[in-house]
A protein has these predicted regions:
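Outer-membrane beta-barrel domain signature
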Residues: 33-39, 72-78, 114-120, 160-168, ...
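Feature captures outer-membrane beta-barrel proteins of Gram-negative bacteria and organelles
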Residues: 18, 44-54, 83-95, 102-104, ...
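C-terminal transmembrane beta-barrel domains of outer membrane proteins
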Residues: 213-386
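Transmembrane beta-barrel strands of outer-membrane/channel proteins
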Residues: 5, 29-33, 60-66, 102-106, ...
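Repeated loop/turn-to-beta-strand initiation elements of outer-membrane beta-barrel proteins
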Residues: 25-27, 54-60, 94-101, 138-143, ...
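Residues that define the transmembrane beta-barrel architecture of outer-membrane proteins
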Residues: 12, 40-44, 81-85, 123-127, ...
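Transmembrane beta-strand segments of outer-membrane beta-barrel domains in Gram-negative
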Residues: 92, 99-258, 314-316
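Outer-membrane beta-barrel initiation region
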Residues: 1-101, 137
Length: 386
């Protein structure tokens, strides 16, 4: 993208000229070790987007995920602990920013390790249809509104007896309305809030489960409401130090099925525990981070950081086997590395993150679910986008 100014036709007028090159293909390759020990620790994700091949602003994105080993990508049976893939398509409706999107994905998890003998397997299919509209687009702030209809079908089964037997079966249809803001009036503010409601259409109710395969939670319902929020505020202190504070959560009075529960674990939440280690119907989390950028070469920067995070997840209407409340807090240090280059004749941005943390969690969850690399408490994240 290149810009320049040229003289206008009227006296004193100026015309902004923008020259851009169309990028037909874009995408990325990602690796991290945020999965549980039972799922093999490592996860690889490959994504490719075809940008406006016809010329109407449409895009088609395809992705796949698996454990990044030969057996993980090509194997079968117990060699495959996690695998998934999907595609999404978006198309602009008119010239006012309204955009329609359609997506579909499938995933499978087959935990190994100490519970491999149970033969547990989970298969999920999901799809969505949505509209997004920019309420306000300015150089210093953006507001966007979205509405989506989501559908999820998840079956958990076991073959411990030698025969595939369903343990639970959830099928949910949800209507979601979301609002997103990003702006930098003084510091930068981001928040995304979403209201969800369960619908009867194509959903599986508790009454259906009484005569067949049960739901994932006996107290869970497909008729629910919940409000979800993720936000952050970042600003510079003493000129060179960036402070970022993240806060969010989910609120509901209903007992939710597994797929609608939220988690306090994530890169911008508590990053020291494996994905999905702590989830609940109601949650809250807060994370603070202090970092500083150092430019090593022209296109290479490193950003050491310190962080502290905590969160709590609550279960509504818990059974005797469920925990009513789980909490965790962690503190650690890490470094982000960012490099842009055009080696091998294509532009790409390579980022990496290494993080060491100390975690304290309810019921010794940190012993079972902390992120590890080569038996050491280290989180590793690698990404190349092109």
């Amino acid at each position: 993208l290149n810009t320049a100014f040229t003289a206008g036709s009227s006296e004193g007028a100026t015309i902004l000229v923008v020259e851009a090159k169309h990028k037909l293909l874009s995408g990325g390759v990602q690796f991290n070790n945020t999965q549980s020990e039972e799922l093999g620790r490592q996860l690889g994700i490959l994504q490719t987007t075809i940008n406006s091949p016809i010329g109407f602003g449409e895009s088609l994105t395809m992705f796949g995920l698996a454990r990044p080993t030969i057996k993980g990508m090509k194997g079968t049976g117990n060699d495959v602990s996690i695998r998934g893939g999907g595609l999404s398509f978006s198309y602009p409706l008119g010239d006012n920013g309204l955009k329609a999107s359609l997506s579909y994905s499938e995933s499978m998890t087959r935990p190994g390790g100490d519970i491999a003998s149970l033969g547990i397997e989970s298969n999920m299919k999901s799809g969505s249809l949505g509209l997004t509209y920019p309420l306000r687009l300015r150089a210093d702030s953006t507001w966007s509104l979205r509405g989506t209809i989501n559908w999820i079908d998840e079956i958990q089964q076991t073959n411990a007896s030698g025969i595939d037997t369903d343990i639970s079966h959830d099928r949910l249809t949800s209507l979601r309305l979301g609002l997103t803001y990003f702006g930098c009036p003084r510091g930068c503010i981001y928040f995304d809030t979403e209201l969800s409601r369960g619908l009867d259409i194509a959903s599986r109710s508790a009454s259906e489960a009484t005569t067949g395969t049960p739901l994932s939670r006996t107290s869970g319902t497909s008729h629910y409401h919940h409000l979800r929020l993720n936000s952050s505020y970042s600003f510079y202190a003493l000129m060179d130090y960036l402070i970022k504070i993240g806060f969010g959560g989910q609120y509901t009075n209903d007992g939710l099925l597994n797929s609608e529960q939220s988690t306090i674990i994530g890169m911008d939440k508590i990053s020291a525990l494996t994905s999905g280690a702590i989830s609940g119907d109601k949650i809250w989390y807060i994370r603070g981070e202090l970092s500083r950028n150092f430019s090593i070469f022209k296109n290479l920067t490193i950003s050491p950081y310190l962080y502290s995070a905590m969160g709590v997840a609550y279960t509504n209407k818990p059974t005797a086997a469920e925990s009513k409340e789980n909490a965790a807090k962690s503190a650690g240090l890490g470094v982000n590395i960012n490099n842009f280059n055009d080696y091998f004749y294509f532009d790409k941005n390579i980022t990496a993150k290494v993080e060491y943390s100390k975690t304290i969690a309810t019921d010794k969850i940190e012993i079972l679910s902390d992120v590890r690399l080569n038996k050491h408490h280290l989180m590793l994240f690698l990404n190349m986008s092109f």
